């Protein structure tokens, strides 16, 4: 059910975003406690402000009310992805080159399933992350198809 909702909402929101020159980062449809939330994360090269989020929310809300693809009651939230933006598409990884990232893999690579460090290279097939182990830097090569989850990571160093 959740994937169908996400696919439907993605198709509905894309023309709105194209018109405003914004990018769809992610969509979540989740139940928290007794309430359902439809969260749409948007961005642009210059970031997004509250007015752009409101425009997208209003336009999408109209389309959702018309088509009524979600039967249960839910709250619609439109926002920026924040500082720890998810990396979902190849283009996201390219934009994140040189930045601090967190990557979780489906299976252990060199004994670990979680990595945090600088995204040093990406070629569409492999993700290269430079991590600090004690006082030395080590480069880990992760096959792109083994990445379960990836996001930018805020570093306080």
Swiss-Prot record:
Its main location: cytoplasm. GO terms for biological process: ribosomal small subunit assembly; translation. InterPro entries: Ribosome_maturation_RimP, RimP_C, RimP_C_sf, RimP_N, RimP_N_sf. Keywords: Cytoplasm, Ribosome biogenesis. Coiled coil: none annotated. The keyword Cytoplasm applies. NCBIfam families: PRK00092.1-2. This is Ribosome maturation factor RimP.
